[in-house]
Amino acid sequence: MMTVLKPGVTDYATPNDTDIVVTRVLKAPRALVFDAWTSPKHLPNWMTGPDGWTMPVCEVDLKPGGAWRYVWRKDDGAEMSMSGFFREVSPPDRVVSTESWGPEWPETLNTVVFTESAGYTTATLTMHFASKETRDAALKTGMKEGMDMGFARLDTLLAAA
């Protein structure tokens, strides 16, 4: 049975042993969602995870082969970072990139596809992990909760645009 998604609700699926598929319907045109998802002007305003975190470093060279890097800082001074390279950039339809949380985590391949219908954009992010163990470990990090908080901020950002 197919799940009907509503704006403001994020769906998380594990269709196989190595993938997580995250789907979110956003009330905004695709070009605007693509820009918010890829621009260092907008990313620090919504992709911050749980309350108390900021993104003081957001570097994006949005082209095939270009690098990206995010650094988050918690209000107590703790930091975490993630980086990768863009493999494919097709505005406003699709972005494929690698993701690394450091040497202790195997690289992930992320593909996000943006589709628009009747003024709403569906963002479908497929995260491909090296193994079931790595995928399951990612799910146990609080990833869903952090992403849900970020997506709520993205909804607010898009509504104000």
Where are these regions (language model features)?
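Intrinsic-disorder/low-complexity, polar/charged segments enriched in Ser/Thr/Lys/Arg/Asp/Glu/Gln
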Residues: 17-23, 55, 67, 81, ...
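Hydrophobic pocket/interface hotspot
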Residues: 33, 43, 68-70, 86, ...
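Hydrophobic/aromatic beta-strand elements that line small-molecule binding cavities or substrate pockets
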Residues: 24, 57-60, 82-88, 99, ...
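A conserved amphipathic terminal alpha-helix motif
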Residues: 1-6, 130-161
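Hydrophobic ligand-binding cavity/cleft-lining segments
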Residues: 1-52
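A short, structured loop/turn motif at beta-sheet edges
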Residues: 30-31, 62-63, 87-93, 113-122
